[in-house]
Amino acid sequence: MSAGLLVRGLNAGYGAIRVLEGIDLEAPPGELTVVVGPNGAGKTTLLRALSGLIPRGGEVTFDGAPLPENPAAIVSRGLAQVPEGRQLFPHMSVRENLELGGYLLARGERAARLARAFEFFPKLAERREQLAGTMSGGEQQMLAVGRALMGKPRLLMLDEPSLGLAPKMVDELLAIVRRIHDDGVTILLVEQNVAKALAIAQGAFVIERGAVVMKGAAGNLLNSEQLRAAYLGATVVRQTGRNSPSGSG
């Protein structure tokens, strides 16, 4: 049986600034695992470290073998990330952006993956020749997820895909994420909408100040008084302006 993603004692940061300290985390194969936490907790830093975008220490394995720190080698192992900034090509069409995600595939397989992406995202199919830069934020987010799927990832990492979206679009996007999971893709989801993320996940981790403070079955955490109290506290911190610096979420 595949071992999925296993993280032990992960340390990461930016230069002399340490953001993550001793992170232990698992994303079992075939499961949808969510990581939540307040602003500045280190959630985005976690995904950047796992994607090889910043140096990391500790042990990270995928399917039982060490995960390299080189982004290209990580992609070749079957991992894909959708960053918070989407990183689309605004002057290229929806179809062209999607096809870039499958540039390593043979032409026939790339066409099949494109058709599959349009099945998941019918709105993209309707706008396949529209320029990405003219789309709404929600449509661009769907395009970013669709492009990541083009490479046939075995593990899909999503960095706050619902950030800045209207509630209806959040529901639509997370429903698609759940469909992708049901299609057999292992997912590690970093999400700022705690209740909605826990509602679609199997496992969950709560990160605060660069450390895992809670973990368990998502349903159990969803009903946890401790989690609700922690997030009430996190909201107060953000409102009073004493939260950690942005960019290390």
Residue ranges and their predicted role:
Residues 2-249:
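Glycine-rich phosphate-binding loops of nucleotide-dependent enzymes
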